Amino acid sequence: MIQQIEITLTPKSRGFHLVTGELMRQLPKLPKTGVINIFCKHTSCGLSINENADPDVRTDMETIFNRLVPENRPEYEHTLEGADDMPAHAKSTLSGVSLTIPITDGRLNMGIWQGIYLCEYRNHGGARKLVVTIIGE
């Protein structure tokens, strides 16, 4: 069985947001065994799996990414869409825009402390569209 759907995440402020619940509420029933691929259709945000318990992790991730790719650098040429745009593209490349997660017994087989993050790199990114492909039996 192969299923593919497109879902939309609600707009988020800039930062790292735990979206596991929002994502799961929009998914069909998962197969007993398989894999799920989640692909983000945007170039200024990303997806990641990281700690789901301590919100300080999300704050620290934002700090780390902002230090790695600062805004307002004079060497940036792509600046028409604002100071946060070119850094958002670079950060998206660093985090990636897709995740593949195993499905076991009809559930995402992630660690107890793992959650799915939307990494929003724009100040006002808007709703984000994800293509979800489920392969399983």
Specify the residue positions occupied by each region the protein language model found.
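Active-site histidine-anchored catalytic micro-motif
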Residues: 1-137
